[in-house]
Every structure is written in C-alpha cells, then in structure tokens.
Swiss-Prot record:
It comes from Streptococcus pyogenes serotype M3 (strain ATCC BAA-595 / MGAS315). The lineage of its organism: Bacteria, Bacillati, Bacillota, Bacilli, Lactobacillales. Its EC number is 6.1.1.15. Keywords: Aminoacyl-tRNA synthetase, ATP-binding, Cytoplasm, Ligase, Nucleotide-binding, Protein biosynthesis. Consists of three domains: the N-terminal catalytic domain, the editing domain and the C-terminal anticodon-binding domain. One of its GO terms (biological process) is prolyl-tRNA aminoacylation. This is Proline--tRNA ligase. Its main location: cytoplasm. InterPro entries: aa-tRNA-synt_IIb, aa-tRNA-synth_II, aa-tRNA-synth_II/BPL/LPL, Anticodon-bd, Anticodon-bd_dom_sf, Pro-tRNA-ligase_IIa, Pro-tRNA-synth_IIa_bac-type, Pro-tRNA-Synthase_IIa_type1. The gene is proS. It is an enzyme of class 6 (ligase).
Amino acid sequence: MKQSKLLIPTLREMPSDAQVISHALMVRAGYVRQVSAGIYAYLPLANRTIEKFKTIMREEFEKIGAVEMLAPALLTADLWRESGRYETYGEDLYKLKNRDNSDFILGPTHEETFTTLVRNAVKSYKQLPLNLYQIQSKYRDEKRPRNGLLRTREFIMKDGYSFHHNYEDLDVTYEDYRQAYEAIFTRAGLDFKGIIGDGGAMGGKDSQEFMAITPARTDLDRWVVLDKSIASMDDIPKEVLEEIKAELAAWMISGEDTIAYSTKSSYAANLEMATNEYKPSSKVAAEDALAEVETPHCKTIDEVAAFLSVDETQTIKTLLFVADNEPVVALLVGNDHINTVKLKNYLAADFLEPASEEEARAFFGAGFGSLGPVNLAQGSRIVADRKVQNLTNAVAGANKDGFHVTGVNPGRDFQAEYVDIREVKEGEMSPDGHGVLQFARGIEVGHIFKLGTRYSDSMGATILDENGRTVPIVMGCYGIGVSRILSAVIEQHARLFVNKTPKGDYRYAWGINFPKELAPFDVHLITVNVKDQVAQDLTAKLEADLMAKGYDVLTDDRNERVGSKFSDSDLIGLPIRVTVGKKAAEGIVEIKIKATGDSIEVNAENLIETLEILTKEH
C-alpha cells in the first residue's frame, strides 16, 4: 500500500486536549479524528488494526461454535419496556421518536433484541444451545466523554448471547468463552487479567471482567527505546534522564478501574467486588456499660477518635442509605470505607443512594457526625460489615448532636445483618489465603455474564424441556469493547524513543510499538530519495518480494524530507522498518526492529531471510 494514497494526517505536536497517551498518539499518528464530542472517525490505520482484531475474534469464536450475525442498531422502545430497562437504564440511553411519534432507542447493548429473536424462533430444548454474536456500533449518551476511545458516545463492540435449556449447559459455554477471551487478548499482545466483576446494568449474576493492565510508567527499560546511537541508559546524562522521567510521568495513567490481585495466586477482582481474608475474632475484654459522652464540634471519625483518645479501629461509622425508597443503616469499622456496589448487591436493590442530611435527621433524630446504631426504632434494617462484629466496647454516635456513646457492643446493643460491605485495602491478605492484595489500574476490554433467566423471565422466552414442561431459556452474555482495544494496546505499547544527534544532543519523542498481530501493516518500507530511480526500482522489487511472502507493506513513496518520514514512522509504530537509502546502488538496505531499536544493514537479496530470523528472535 502506497502511503501517498492513504489518509494519515500526522501532527508535529501532541494534541493539547489529550490527557492520556493513547488518545494523544492516536490523534498525532493519524489513526483517529474526533467528529464531535465522544464521536470519532476511524481513519485507515485504525480501521486496519480494528479489522485485524476482528479477524482474531472470529477465528477464536469459530473454535467454540459461535455464529456471527447482525442485529439492528435502531431498536423499538417496546422491547426495552418488556425487560424493564427502558425506565431503569438511566440517562445514558439515547431515546428518540420517529415521524409517527413512536419511541425508539439507539442500542447500547442487545439482550432484548436477541432474546426476542430466539423467543420467536425456538420452541424446544432440542433447538438449543444457540451461540450467536455480532460486531457493530453501540451508543451511550455519556455525560462527559473523555480519554479518547475509552469513554465515547459511539463505540464498536462485539456482543454475544448464548441460549440454553439448563444451567449446566450454560456453564460449559461460559467456560468456552472465558478460554476464547484469554486466547484473543493474548494474541492481541495485551497484558491482562481476568477478574471477578459486577453484573451492573446487564443484570447478570456470575461475571468475569477482562482488564488490560495500565501500569505506572516508572520502569525506564520498559518504556524507553534507545536508538543505536546510544549504547545504554548509563550513557545518558543525568539531567536528560530526569527530563525523560518527567515526560513519562506527565501522562495520566488511563486505567478507568482499580483492580485488586493477589501476589501469589490467580485471585483478581474489580475493587468494587474485591474481598480479603476474614477471620472472626473472639471477644476477650469484658463488656463495659454504655456511656454517653459529649463530643463538641466532632463531625468526623478522626476528630472523634482524637477527642476521645481511641483508635479509629475502635469506632463505628454509621451511614444511612435509601434502597428502593426504603432506609437502610450501614455500619463499618471507623477507618474503613463503604463499598456501595457490595451493599447494593446484597440488598438486591435497583436503586441505592446516600440519604440526605434531612433524611438522616428524620430517621436518627440527629445530623451527620452523630449517628449510631443504638436505640434505633424497632424494625430498622441494619447491615454491618463483618468486621464490626469483632468490636468490643466501641464508640458510636449517640443520635444526639454533639454526643457519642462509648462501650458499644454488637449483639448486646444492636442487632445487624453481617456481610462484607467494605472496600479492601492494599496489603491485606488475599481471600484465598495466598499472598497479599496489590492494586493496579486497568481498562475493561471484555466482560462475560451468566444472565440466567433475567431476560427470558421478563420477556416470556420459554421452551418445552425434555419432560414437556414450559421453562424459561437460560442465557449468557459476552462482550468485548472492540474500539477501546486500540486504546488499551497503545497504552501498553506506547514508547519514548530516544536518540543522539551527530552534535551530541539528546532527543526523545513518543511513538507506538504495535504488536505484530494488530499492527496495521507489518513492514514500513521507506524510500529516502523518491527521485533516485535506482532506489525506486529497488523499493518496488522489495515491496513485491515482501508481499509475495505474506507481509503487509506500507511503502512511504512521499516526496518528503527523510527526517519527516522517520518521525512519522516512529509515530505510526509498525514492527519493522526497511529503509532504502544512500546505498541503494550497492543493493544495501537497513532493517530496524521497532521494539528494540536495533538496526542492521543487509544485502537486499537477503532481506526476506534476515527478516524471518529477526522476527523469530523478537
């Protein structure tokens, strides 16, 4: 492919509105352009990368018997009313009317559509299982689109749906998809973890997220690629190294979620779902009597603890939530933080929000800072974190402004439902007892759910089972964020390329180091002087030879300065660069491996053979 024929609008500078390196490089390297807020055009390079990823997906899904189809993006609102999500999905749902004033939506996901199609076509367990998927654009009216392709209003997604006559059959397909996803993301060159996830708006129970890890850019050996003009990091002056470190640190780590993972086992979970090893403790101290103490001007846990000279771990944090219009009291050990996802899931609530100060005062008789679990109205629902039951003689609010109660003992002074509702902390023991929890940032690239009968129940999707009984179809759901894969790969494979000029100056610039499977082309073939006919002829021969061996070749045939060509090549990020330069008449070309910065000169006749050796090594 001739570069002069492609739309690759590279920029000299990083875009000023970009906060994450993937967004900056996609724009600067000419992969994407924003059309309006949260809406992007995928230019030829991005489209080629996305198509390569689609090919990987299709190959892996064929292995597990998944069949591709295409559903409409424009959906009738009636289907979403059937499932109940038209009202509950929230403001992210694009709603519109046609000329007949009928309600429609732009699909953010397609559970209802696929359920309806199968409901109307499948009547017997003998017609199951079915394993269907599609790849198409989705729409969500994001309040604040940001970070390039990571949070957009239109995005490309692969969503799959499986249909079964029982849960045992679903379990088999779920495991097939889990393995297929691992194969897909491995082939795509991603550093990822499969983690325990939350079903969220999908309505699933068991689920697993696949997170592309976005580590801090502190490891120079990983993030910096040295040109052949620099032997090692030790040769770079200290002041230049400090500049390089500052440039690496200047770009925000783009991971949208925090994950907790074990240092010694396979345990990993989204922070919203992560738990830790818990061991109930026996009470050894005698229980004190309750005593009300004045705590003037103490509104926070740390202020109360300091005033009473107790540790924060001996205090009870009392919170009030409204769950589906019903008040729920939540209790935590004072230095812990509430995990609202865990609480919402435990309550099986559709809506959960913190109560207002007015609501708290009406319920407790006091304002924030003085709330506690003692002497609440009969029938009050109290959900306490499991650590609370280990407390003896704790401090809690007295439900009287400016006062607290000491000597509070769970079981004696209040009754509660005990469950894990806290956020885990880094360094705590993994729940499986192996290793401690560490945190990392990550980008969600895939998610699989066991939906069960959530949609078949609400939409009447039933079959006759082997005993002739009418039963709901059991479903699974499997998504991959196709367009955000591009962002995730660039976040992990962006590199700072450093070289030394003939005058001894050090220069560095960002570029992409695409893994071979997703690079838009395999080889960047550059002619230094397009007016040199010998070089032109050699370039044409090499292009034909490479293509005959199955290489995708981008040939830079532009009449541009060589420095501009090399800068664009570093930005675009193809794995191999072959330069036809001053030694073209001698039949000598230069090969450069992008990942390492290594370069060698070879006879053009030996190019293919040399590339085969080099690509095996790297």
